[in-house]
Every structure is written in structure tokens, then in C-alpha cells.
Amino acid sequence: MQKVKEVNANRLREAVRLRKAVYKDGKPSFSSASYDSLSLAADPSLELSYLVAPPRMAYYEKVSRQIYGIYLKYIAPEDIVVYSIDEVFIDATSYLSHYNMTAHDLAMTIIREVLYTTGITATAGIGTNLYLAKLAMDITAKHAAPDKDGVRIAELDEESFRYLLWDYKPLTDFWMTGPGTVKRLEKHGIHTMGELAYFSTVNQDILYREFGVDAELLIDHAWGLEPCSIKEIKAYKPSTNSISEGLVLSCPYPYDKARIIIMEMADSLVLQLTDKGLVTDSLTLDVGYDRENCDSGKYRGPVHIDHYGRTVPKGAHGSTKLDNPTNLGSQLIKVAATLFDQIADKTLTV
């Protein structure tokens, strides 16, 4: 919402400069509002508007399962890795000769069926490894022009990656390169993947001192390499298991209502434990506070900048160890509520 306000403030100034603004009670105003990008680009007197859609996770999950069913018409489950509710990795290598298609044609065929069945369009990235496929979707395709149905498809191999993305900024757009990693790279004068690739040829030891074993992954990615395959992902067996539950609230919640949400989330975790035949001996809780706490001007505690660039109170974090492993609902819900009581600030909205 803050970003929209900033955009509209700039649009109104531009409308005044171009003498496109309308005046109400002597003050410059917008002529109308729109959320259509083409209309907004053509008419600076339009205010940027937006639709607020309440989250419907159960429905999203239902549609996601429907789309996954379409994938299974073309690809075996052992060649698909579900990355998120709206994203998968597919190893299509052995299917291209079977269908007598290029990777682009197969991707478009699947996307078209998803579109005709669900009305949902898609973006696809094609690469010679998992990393390049992800970058092709996240960066290259999103900068490409969509077709008449809004479909974007892009392809990358090691050579085109180096040609197209070695000078690309910001580094945080690259998969698995977060803000913390970028800051540590910038200490060594590294601001692009091309600079990282060159640095690895002359100062590889510095990278290993800075990042430890993670340097190997960084160096591989700088050269467009990714040794891990879907087959290896499928074969991986973790030595320990963890189950998590996260929730983004649709509006600020006071302490008492947030406590109820915590108990409901704990109940959901219990169901997951029971379903998987697991028990737990520890519980960890992270609580984020809403920006309205800072906007009111009353909060004077520690703050940090969130992913949207907003100033918010520093979140709460805590863990607790159980005496004995359990998946008993009444016990875990009580533990979660007690932990929330211990770490959460009762005066702040969540």
C-alpha cells in the first residue's frame, strides 16, 4: 500500500506537469482510476488502483493438485519435483524423443492444456540444469514479451547464461543468492555473476574462507553449473525431519487473537505429525509484528527493515525443548501457547 501511494504521488505530479490533472476544490486530482497497465501507461491522469483478494489457501491447493494432474499426463512423477504451490521442476530429457518435440514445444503443450483446463497462464524456464531452468523462468522469461495468452518461455544454457546474465543486476534476483550473501560478496567488490566467476579464478581461497563449503555452490552458479539433478533430489533422505507451519495474516491481529492463531497452527502441526507417524521433542516459534506499530509513533523498541522496505518492530523468536518426544495435540498446543506468551509483546499487533 505504501508503494502504491508513492507511485500515485509521482503520477499526480506528472499529470500536473503535463496539464492532464483535473482540479477539485482547487486541488489537482486524478480523472479516474485503473489497474490496467496499458491504460495507466497511456494516461498519466489515471490513479493506480488495485484489488485486494483475501487468501484462499484451500482453493489454491485444490487448483495446484489439478494442475499437477495435468503434468502427470505427460511426465512421470519420478521426474517432477514440486518446489512450491505454483512451481515445479521437470526433467524432460527422456521425453523429448518420445514426443518428438523440442523442450520449448513440450513446455508450451503442457502450458496450453493448463490454460484451457483452468484458465491459468504460466511462465516456463528451460535450462540445461536445474539452476539455469530456474533463472530462465525467474529472470529471462519475466523480461520477455508474453504471447496473446500471457505465456512466457525462455531458455538458457551455460553459454547464453554467461552472455546474458553475467552483467545482470541485482544479484539478489539470482536463485539462492540472498541479501546476506550479496553483502558479503560486495565486501570483495563483487556485484555481478561475471565478477564472481572471474574472482573464483584468481581468489578462490578467499571465497572459501568467507563462505566455507557454500563457496563451491556459489562458484558453480557463477559459471552456470549445477551438479544436483532431480534424480538425486528424489533419492535424498534427510537424517532428521522437521515440519513447519507458516501463516500471513490478512490484517493486524491483537495479542489475544494472535494467540488463538498460534494454537490453531500448532493443531495443524499435530495433524501433520500424526499423518507422518512422527513425534517431536522441540518447538520453535517466530512472530512478526505489523508495521502499524511503528506508524502510530508510539513504539520505541528495536526495529528492522522487512522484505518490502518497511520499518517494523523486531520480531520475536523462541524455542522450547520437551521432556519427552510426543505428537499429543493437547500437550503441543499448550506448549505453543506458553511459548507465545513468553516471547510475544502483548502491546503489539501481529
Residue ranges and their predicted role:
Residues M1-D220, E226-I230:
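Gly/Gly-Pro- and Ser/Thr-rich, intrinsically disordered tail segments characteristic of DNA damage-repair
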